[in-house]
Amino acid sequence: MKTLDINQIKQYLPHRYPMLLVDRVLTWESGKSITAIKNVTANEEFFNGHFPHKPVMPGVLMIEALAQTAALLSFLTMGQKPDDNSVVYFIGIDGARFKRPVEPGDQLKMEVEILRNARGIWKYKATGSVDGQLALEAELMCTMRTINDAGSTAGQ
């Protein structure tokens, strides 16, 4: 079983505090799938304003956690680490549904499967769960560009 700790994750994802939303990879299979976790603590910055009386992880950050997990799978599949000359863009989302809130103390388990990779566009099926209960699901798309090509249209 292939796993990654936070130090290994930081070699593949350019995100840093407070935007790094993947804490550990439980398992991954190149070209297929990945399972990772985000430990949601009461100390998360976003809980200060979302919402002080009933803190819940913003849906957009749950999607971002899935997208980071997907990007991690792509980098691992390509055997490539990000560098100063490349950028990964999150370019699409379909069928996003939120099924339960994610609160302080929860562990968000993220499962991402590659559906396809064509013309430089990766498509994934992604889910997040807490204690075996589905919290969110979506299909995600992303692409990688060199800095010089970063303004070009996806897929070109």
From Swiss-Prot:
Query: Which keywords does UniProt give here?
Result: Cytoplasm, Lipid A biosynthesis, Lipid biosynthesis, Lipid metabolism, Lyase
Kindly indicate whether the keyword Secreted belongs to this entry.
Answer: no
Short name of one Pfam family: FabA
What reactions does this protein catalyze? a (3R)-hydroxyacyl-[ACP] = a (2E)-enoyl-[ACP] + H2O
Q: Name one GO molecular function term.
A: (3R)-hydroxyacyl-[acyl-carrier-protein] dehydratase activity
Return the broad EC class: lyase
Predominant cellular place of this UniProt entry's protein: cytoplasm
Which cellular component, as a GO term, is one annotated location? membrane
What SUPFAM superfamilies is this protein classified in? Thioesterase/thiol ester dehydrase-isomerase
Please state which protein family the record places this protein in: Belongs to the thioester dehydratase family. FabZ subfamily.
In its UniProt entry, what is this protein called?
Answer: 3-hydroxyacyl-[acyl-carrier-protein] dehydratase FabZ
Query: What organism is this sequence from?
Result: Herminiimonas arsenicoxydans
